[in-house]
Amino acid sequence: MTVVYHELLPDSYLLILAPSRSDEPEAALAHSLHCAQRSGKPAVWVDCGMLHSLSDEAAQLLWGAHHQLEEKHSQLVLVHVPERVKKDLLKRELGPAPCMVPTLLDAARQTAQQRDDQAV
């Protein structure tokens, strides 16, 4: 998997993913998720709109990031998730699934809602 874009936003860290050769290790994704988790932002948004499928390694990395962010009271939000990618991720289900939303605007709303819920 190739991370084609990353941006530190006011309330989140955005990663946009693109497919790479299937035999390549997921080092770029692992590094980018690690940086995103260390950003201190309340949410990490991962745009999956360019992906056609998800490798087992990528699914494990996303699940791991999801659990680590939850421990820090942060959130992994997957955006523009194609049905095949969702299926690849959920077949490795390791507890409650990460939040999946159709658009970046929905991701912003989800992040704001979580922030409001934590403030109460």
Identify what each model region corresponds to:
Residues L61:
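Internal alpha/beta domain cores that form substrate/cofactor-binding pockets in large enzymes
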Residues M1-H52, G64-V120:
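STAS-like cytosolic regulatory interaction modules
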Residues S55-A58:
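Conserved phosphotransfer microenvironments
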